[in-house]
């Protein structure tokens, strides 16, 4: 990537827009591709993304575009902020244009049919591309408002990590590197499920003890699952694990938290998602995670409980009683204690 080349951001949502602005602040020309010509024109004219990031000025160095072919041909570094359901359809026709380029996934989701993470799908679509992920406790609005923020870029490709750090690292945004791409990405996807539970707990005024218990047991549960799939447990003690889990389970700005809060207020799942007006990846992740956990025989009582409420007709009180009456397990069972006194 030369200094003259623009950087691409694929996706017109809140996070894609926040990252596009960060890149622009760091001196890059940015091509932000989106499917909706009306949205692109609105941003072009008003310098604001009113649908997803109202009140935040989009910098003049960010050019909203709708020609994906020209965008991919012009850029070597491409940030992919597309919904998980759209990834294959958008990128599959452009394999030749993506060969050898750096593709960095910003999407925290899991494909329903295959249980593949977004970077794994990118790898499948474009085997010759250089793949990375960006994940961490990163609420889009706070990034856009310049709240002090840290994130993790993960890839086996050290040079890619360095390129992303150079592109994004700034006065309010700190970028750490990791070679555990799978663990970093899995943490970002799994925590969305627990944010729904946390939002429900707050809406029902369950108290601080309960919220703390839920977040801590969620960390144990998601790490237990991730380790069973080959992830490094230490990844989950960092920004992409416990860091992301805390912010997503604590903030009303989190989309999945908002869905959970609406459910706790008595709305149906359909009404909660409609009220949000954006994709809440946690709902889709819950479905596939429940099946996968059963398949690999990993104990995930919070996942099973939320699934029972949303899709099996169980009441919240029934699930809470079952969870509290279950046999207590070991507190921290996902990290080997070998070598410790």
From Swiss-Prot:
Record field: catalytic activity: sn-glycerol 3-phosphate + NAD(+) = dihydroxyacetone phosphate + NADH + H(+); sn-glycerol 3-phosphate + NADP(+) = dihydroxyacetone phosphate + NADPH + H(+)
Amino-acid positions noted as binding NADPH in the UniProt annotation, renumbered to this chain: 14-15, 35, 108, 140, 255, 279, 281
SUPFAM superfamilies: 6-phosphogluconate dehydrogenase C-terminal domain-like, NAD(P)-binding Rossmann-fold domains
A molecular-function term among this protein's GO annotations: NAD binding
GO annotation (BP), single: glycerophospholipid biosynthetic process
Keywords: Cytoplasm, Lipid biosynthesis, Lipid metabolism, NAD, NADP, Nucleotide-binding, Oxidoreductase, Phospholipid biosynthesis, Phospholipid metabolism
Localization annotation: Cytoplasm
Database matches in Pfam families: NAD_Gly3P_dh_C, NAD_Gly3P_dh_N
Record-listed E.C. numbers: 1.1.1.94
Enzyme class: oxidoreductase
Cellular component GO terms, alphabetical: cytosol
Function: Catalyzes the reduction of the glycolytic intermediate dihydroxyacetone phosphate (DHAP) to sn-glycerol 3-phosphate (G3P), the key precursor for phospholipid synthesis.
HAMAP family with a match to the protein in the record: NAD_Glyc3P_dehydrog
Protein's recorded name: Glycerol-3-phosphate dehydrogenase [NAD(P)+]
Annotated source species: Pseudomonas savastanoi pv. phaseolicola (strain 1448A / Race 6) (Pseudomonas syringae pv. phaseolicola (strain 1448A / Race 6))
Gene that specifies this protein: gpsA
């Amino acid at each position: 990537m030369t200094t003259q080349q623009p950087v691409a951001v694929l996706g017109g949502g809140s996070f894609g827009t926040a990252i596009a602005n960060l890149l622009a602040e760091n001196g890059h020309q940015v091509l932000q591709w989106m499917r909706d010509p009306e949205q692109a024109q609105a941003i072009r004219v008003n310098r604001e993304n009113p649908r997803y990031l109202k009140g935040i000025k989009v910098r003049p160095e960010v050019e909203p575009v709708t020609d994906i072919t020209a965008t991919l041909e012009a850029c070597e570094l491409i940030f992919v902020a597309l919904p998980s359901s759209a990834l294959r359809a958008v990128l599959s026709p452009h394999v030749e244009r993506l060969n050898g380029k750096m593709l960095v996934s910003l999407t925290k989701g899991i494909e329903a049919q295959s249980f593949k993470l977004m970077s794994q799908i990118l790898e499948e679509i474009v085997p010759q591309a250089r793949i990375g992920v960006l994940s961490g406790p990163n609420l889009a609005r706070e990034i856009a408002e310049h709240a002090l923020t840290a994130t993790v870029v993960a890839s086996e490709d050290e040079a890619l990590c360095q390129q992303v750090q150079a592109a994004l690292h700034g006065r309010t945004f700190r970028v750490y590197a990791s070679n555990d791409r799978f663990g970093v990405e899995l943490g970002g996807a799994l925590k969305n499920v627990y944010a729904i539970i946390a939002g429900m707990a707050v809406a029902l005024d369950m108290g601080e003890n309960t919220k703390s218990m839920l977040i801590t047991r969620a960390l144990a549960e998601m790490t237990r699952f991730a380790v069973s799939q080959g992830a490094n447990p230490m990844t989950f003690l960092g920004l992409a694990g416990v860091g992301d889990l805390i912010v997503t389970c604590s903030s009303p700005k989190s989309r999945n938290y908002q869905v959970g809060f609406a459910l706790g207020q008595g709305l149906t799942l359909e009404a909660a998602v409609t009220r949000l007006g954006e994709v809440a990846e946690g709902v889709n992740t819950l479905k596939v995670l429940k099946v996968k956990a059963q398949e690999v025989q990993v104990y995930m009582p919070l996942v099973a409980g939320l699934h029972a409420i949303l899709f099996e007709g169980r009441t919240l009180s029934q699930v809470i009683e079952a969870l509290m009456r279950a046999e207590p397990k070991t507190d921290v069972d996902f990290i080997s204690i070998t070598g410790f006194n």
